[in-house]
């Protein structure tokens, strides 16, 4: 059998799967596989499932040989040395993808060596991450990767028995696949999903630094093998394959103007185009635009999504063959997407850049990325370079869209929207009922996003799509090519309000009518809550909470975090693992904390009452955007502030790195505040938090370290109870605020201390009401105590919790 590119990619994807078998059966006699090498087990794996591979048009014997014969240096086992061009292609891809193995060291029994987190070796501010490893099998019956599984432990659960459980899961997934009639690409991507589930938490190599998962290594090997095979036109000689040259293209795609595009919505009221639906749809459009550009390129060249080696947050990196066809596809894509952007007002600007490189350049991937980013910077200096002249003519004046203000409205009447904003509202309404995203080459179910060469629809099952995104980390086989990409986020609906308040639908309708919140759309459980409803569901003052968080030092982490004296450890596998793991946090972990907070009860130390409260309140939060390394959430302000504290704690547990922290801004705003203004204020708040040292949340006018904020939460709750019991009056509290604002900003230390006698005098009123309360608030006389330093934060927190306006 002469291999095609997809078959060679499959061999690359499976080449080290035998390591799972060898570790599960470590030290045991195995009559089926006498030499017990991982290469022998790889061949055994393929032959055990020969029917599955044969059903997809593959020769199992060819696949077994091509996948297992990838060790050129095994001179004492010639049966595993490459001979055919296909075998050499996989062997070379394995070598290029394994540069971290050259670091040496390591040891220990392979089944007992845990996978270290990708953050472990990041050197930031002179510090590396803490020791720890992943448990591939966890509490509650977890086997492999799922929400809550990527938290390092000091004593991870890893052993032969754990590998046996993983092997059972993998075998079970293949049995499920056998029930479908799978094409070759669907088989490749279903296998990739099964390997992602079972091999994401085990190391590729246990004899060197074990910080690259076996899944990440297999995926990258498949991508390199596919690109290398296509470079040679599908019929190379072994000699031509082994001769190095600029056979690869590394491509970066970047959507510019993301925040401006998402937040450029003129109408902020729910009645103007249904902003609660449209804002999430517009954010999703940005993510899907980048994905559509990447998938369109890969499809044109006959590659799979495995060749998207990095990507998140409107940016992607592709590994392509350096062929005339690939370069022509890149040029055509750049122009087609540029014209698409111009037609839509130019608020979202796609950029595409690439560099050619040799196989040996995988050795210094950091230098390769630097070249690529320089090319991208040059590309950004000349957007829409394909335009020779405008060539446009003025048309009849049209009313601008009432929502975006960029495109002409469909009708010349007040409040009329452009077709794109109308579609966003329809997509937003469809989001709660969708469990997948489909990419179509021709017609797609309406409403859909219309990108150059592709249409993208939401819902299920989306027949006719050539590629699907799953909305959850779901690894069960599907009949069509797909991957797990949780991009749809969370929209709070009426059903969540009913659960949080213990209401019936009739009670909810009566409440909405009394609050003046009823719209034209009749209430039903699937209806998306408006911003006004979310504000009214706050406990305390009816304001909308807004939270923007960003991962600190991530740019530094990717650029120089793996750099050491004389060498750079930033291999493509390490960077892919870092990107993928970070994406899991900002998509899956954030989403799961929103929708299923009880999962984190033990990890975050909640009691029953606290877990019950969070389970009712957190689903009311609205994810405008969460992915890459940042997020933007809205919702009832009290629930959102609690959520921010829990999420920051989870992030620390997730990274176990003292320099990997979160910074951001939190605001209370009226629900009618225009979205562009809200985004601007949040951006300024986030900048203030970072400017004052990072690892802070800016709220109520101050940037507060997270651990300090947890202590202030107790002060806020204590004051709230004192206000309710009338142990402290509001006048007393406003007096404290007045003294703080008068004296704290003073530059002279002595002058700042003048607040103390005035505060002591004011506190006499508290003593008259309650002696114990008075003793607690005497701490405010210590000017170094956080309770005084950040008094406006906890005082306003308590006042807003006790106020309805």
UniProtKB/Swiss-Prot annotation:
Residues 542-702 form the GGDEF domain. Signal peptide: none annotated. Its cofactor is a divalent metal cation. InterPro entries: Cas10-Cmr2_palm2, Cas10/Csm1, Cas10/Csm1_subtype-III-A, Csm1_B, GGDEF_dom, HD_domain, Rev_trsase/Diguanyl_cyclase. Residues 99-119 are annotated as: Disordered. PROSITE patterns: GGDEF (PS50887). Residues 1-99 are annotated as: HD domain. It catalyses: 4 ATP = cyclic tetraadenylate + 4 diphosphate. Keywords: Antiviral defense, ATP-binding, Endonuclease, Exonuclease, Hydrolase, Nuclease, Nucleotide-binding, Plasmid, RNA-binding, Transferase. The N-terminal HD domain has ssDNase activity. The C-terminal GGDEF domain has the cOA synthesis activity. Belongs to the CRISPR-associated Cas10/Csm1 family. CRISPR (clustered regularly interspaced short palindromic repeat) is an adaptive immune system that provides protection against mobile genetic elements (viruses, transposable elements and conjugative plasmids). CRISPR clusters contain spacers, sequences complementary to antecedent mobile elements, and target invading nucleic acids. CRISPR clusters are transcribed and processed into CRISPR RNA (crRNA). This subunit is a single-strand-specific deoxyribonuclease (ssDNase) which digests both linear and circular ssDNA; it has both exo- and endonuclease activity. This is CRISPR system single-strand-specific deoxyribonuclease Cas10/Csm1 (subtype III-A).
């Amino acid at each position: 059998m002469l291999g095609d590119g997809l078959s060679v990619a499959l061999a690359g994807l499976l080449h080290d799967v035998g390591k799972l078998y060898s570790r599960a059966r470590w030290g045991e006699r195995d009559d089926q596989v006498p030499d017990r090498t991982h290469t022998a087990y790889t061949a055994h794996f393929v032959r055990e499932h020969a029917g599955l591979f044969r059903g997809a048009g593959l020769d199992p014997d060819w696949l077994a040989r091509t996948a297992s014969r990838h060790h050129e240096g095994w001179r004492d086992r010639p049966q595993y040395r490459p001979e055919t061009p296909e075998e050499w292609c996989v062997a070379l891809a394995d070598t290029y993808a394994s540069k971290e193995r050259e670091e040496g060291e390591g040891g220990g029994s392979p089944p007992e060596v845990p996978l270290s987190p990708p953050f472990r070796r990041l050197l930031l501010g002179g510090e590396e991450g803490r020791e720890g490893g992943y448990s591939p099998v966890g509490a509650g019956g977890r086997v492999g990767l799922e929400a809550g599984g990527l938290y390092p432990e000091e004593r991870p659960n890893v052993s032969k028995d754990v590998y046996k459980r993983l092997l059972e899961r993998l075998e079970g997934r293949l049995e499920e696949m056998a029930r479908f009639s799978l094409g070759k690409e669907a088989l490749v991507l279903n296998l990739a999903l099964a390997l992602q589930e079972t091999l994401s938490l085990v190391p590729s190599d246990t004899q060197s630094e074990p910080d690259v998962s076996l899944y990440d290594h297999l995926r990258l090997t498949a991508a390199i093998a596919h690109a290398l095979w296509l470079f040679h036109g599908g019929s190379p000689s072994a000699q031509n394959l082994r001769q190095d040259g600029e056979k690869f293209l590394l491509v970066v795609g970047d959507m510019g103007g993301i925040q401006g595009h998402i937040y450029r919505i003129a109408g902020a009221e729910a009645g103007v185009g249904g902003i609660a639906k449209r804002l999430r749809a517009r954010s999703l459009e940005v993510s899907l635009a980048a994905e559509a550009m990447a998938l369109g390129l890969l499809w044109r060249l006959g590659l799979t999504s495995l060749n998207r080696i990095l990507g998140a947050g409107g940016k992607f990196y592709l590994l392509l063959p350096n062929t005339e066809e690939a370069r022509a596809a890149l040029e055509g894509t750049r122009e087609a997407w540029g014209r698409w952007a111009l037609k839509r007002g130019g608020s979202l600007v796609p950029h595409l850049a690439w560099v050619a490189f040799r196989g040996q350049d995988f050795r210094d991937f950091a230098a390769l990325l630097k070249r690529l980013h320089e090319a991208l910077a040059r590309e950004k200096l000349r957007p829409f370079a394909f335009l020779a002249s405008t060539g446009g003519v003025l048309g009849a004046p049209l009313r601008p869209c009432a929502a975006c203000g960029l495109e002409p409205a469909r009708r010349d009447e007040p409040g009329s929207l452009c077709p794109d904003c109308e579609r966003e509202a329809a997509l937003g309404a469809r989001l709660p009922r969708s469990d997948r995203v489909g990419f179509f080459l021709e017609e797609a179910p309406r409403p859909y996003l219309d990108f150059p060469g592709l249409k993208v629809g939401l819902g299920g099952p989306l027949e006719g799509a050539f590629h699907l995104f799953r909305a959850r980390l779901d690894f069960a086989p599907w009949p069509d090519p797909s991957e797990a990409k949780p991009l749809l986020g969370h929209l709070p609906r009426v059903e969540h309000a009913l659960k949080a308040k213990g209401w019936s639908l009739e009670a909810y309708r009566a409440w909405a009518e009394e609050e003046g919140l009823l719209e034209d759309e009749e209430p039903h459980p699937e209806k998306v809550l408006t911003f006004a409803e979310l504000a009214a569901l706050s406990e305390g003052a009816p304001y909308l909470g807004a939270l923007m968080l960003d991962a600190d030092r991530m740019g530094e982490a990717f650029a120089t975090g793996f750099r050491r004296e004389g060498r750079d450890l930033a291999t493509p596998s390490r960077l892919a693992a870092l990107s993928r793991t970070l994406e899991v946090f900002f998509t899956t972990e954030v989403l799961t904390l929103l929708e299923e907070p009880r999962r984190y009860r033990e990890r975050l130390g909640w009691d029953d009452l606290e877990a019950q409260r969070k389970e009712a309140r957190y689903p009311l939060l609205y994810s405008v955007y969460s992915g890459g390394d940042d997020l933007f959430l809205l919702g009832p302000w009290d629930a959102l502030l609690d959520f921010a504290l829990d999420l920051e704690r989870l992030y620390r547990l997730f990274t176990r790195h003292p320099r990997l922290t979160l910074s951001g801004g939190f605001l209370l705003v009226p629900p009618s505040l225009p979205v562009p203004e809200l985004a601007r204020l949040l951006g300024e708040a986030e900048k203030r938090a970072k400017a004052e040292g990072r690892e802070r949340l800016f709220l109520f006018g101050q940037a507060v370290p997270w651990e300090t904020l947890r202590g202030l939460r107790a002060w806020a709750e204590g004051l709230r109870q004192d206000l309710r019991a009338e142990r402290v009056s509001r006048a007393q509290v406003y007096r404290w605020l007045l003294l703080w604002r008068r004296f704290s900003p003073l530059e002279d230390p002595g002058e700042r201390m003048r607040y103390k006698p005035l505060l002591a005098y004011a506190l006499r009123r508290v003593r008259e009401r309650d002696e114990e309360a008075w003793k607690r608030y005497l701490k405010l006389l210590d000017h170094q105590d956080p309770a005084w330093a950040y008094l406006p934060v906890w005082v306003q927190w308590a006042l807003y919790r006790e106020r309805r306006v």
